[in-house]
Amino acid sequence: MLEQMGIAAKQASYKLAQLSSREKNRVLEKIADELEAQSEIILNANAQDVADARANGLSEAMLDRLALTPARLKGIADDVRQVCNLADPVGQVIDGGVLDSGLRLERRRVPLGVIGVIYEARPNVTVDVASLCLKTGNAVILRGGKETCRTNAATVAVIQDALKSCDLPAGAVQAIDNPDRALVSEMLRMDKYIDMLIPRGGAGLHKLCREQSTIPVITGGIGVCHIYVDESAEIAEALKVIVNAKTQRPSTCNTVETLLVNKNIADSFLPALSKQMAESGVTLHADAAALAQLQAGPAKVVAVKAEEYDDEFLSLDLNVKIVSDLDDAIAHIREHGTQHSDAILTRDMRNAQRFVNEVDSSAVYVNASTRFTDGGQFGLGAEVAVSTQKLHARGPMGLEALTTYKWIGIGDYTIRA
């Protein structure tokens, strides 16, 4: 089965690479329109997936990731339209010039070819990834989690119908609908057809891909994100940022999981934090230095376990640790962070600059929420993933991250001397 999908995707990629921006936007507009026109079919399929997942004991955080609503589906369609409005990087001349030999040389952006994406209970990923791949002239093979099987099948059927209505091959966007985990291992060895692989899931999936894949892998998306509250932070303003970073949508990878509090501000900050977290329904996992003071407040508090500093809660849970100073905070982030998104709240711009320079994450913020790490927020459109590695792409992966380049030399029967 996968062999045939690979052949179809590779053939489709040749066709997609030749499309103009106008032609690619036409199919994207058609996909957006059809997602809305066929919304009832997609939502019914999703309702069945959610019901099955709930019956199987899926966590509330994962159920939130899985669930579609009419508003969320409309937002997904609108994201596709936003991709239409983005500049097409394909064909862009990055640099170039004329050599002494007279050869005119340029470096031009081109599609990667075929992208493989493995992800879990996130039905929006299906459309986000497909739209970005199509905009950049890439074919894509999707392998979603078993929890989204019906939703993905319905969504991909809509996308393929839109492709065919625009005289493009359905093989441009395909999904593996068999939940057999053995197919993941098989997919990881499809280097004959797939040019880049992007896993979007837990640490286990990333480890499997790094160890078994014969395809170049872009890893990321695991977000053990931190906020450091410096001693000069404005408490009321800091709390607004923390509430946003923790509660706006707890199941996302850019949600803060650990709060590091400078010891010199702890006595005034912790009572205010407890009050705010109680109102927000957040459970605090406190270290020994913060535990007694937080237990005196209204928030629900438990003693933090050492391993929780490495956990991506994806829920209304927040670690709280007292640190001696900025150096202590940076050391903690280096040990427990995932190089995703980390922030400092401070009025001391020297400390802010040190934090920016010394915290080696794909996105670092000063006096802002970690929730901004998102393709849409960065003006990149829907993202294919958030890369936490350093080669090829880093941070939210928009259109340019789905391209490579080729060198093109144009001469007049020019020969090398």
From Swiss-Prot:
Transmembrane segments: none annotated. The keyword Oxidoreductase applies. The keyword Transferase does not apply. One of its GO terms (cellular component) is cytoplasm. It catalyses: L-glutamate 5-semialdehyde + phosphate + NADP(+) = L-glutamyl 5-phosphate + NADPH + H(+). Signal peptide: none annotated. Keywords: Amino-acid biosynthesis, Cytoplasm, NADP, Oxidoreductase, Proline biosynthesis. One of its GO terms (biological process) is L-proline biosynthetic process. It holds the Pfam family Aldedh. Belongs to the gamma-glutamyl phosphate reductase family. Catalyzes the NADPH-dependent reduction of L-glutamate 5-phosphate into L-glutamate 5-semialdehyde and phosphate. The product spontaneously undergoes cyclization to form 1-pyrroline-5-carboxylate. This is Gamma-glutamyl phosphate reductase. It comes from Escherichia coli (strain SMS-3-5 / SECEC). The lineage of its organism: Bacteria, Pseudomonadati, Pseudomonadota, Gammaproteobacteria, Enterobacterales.
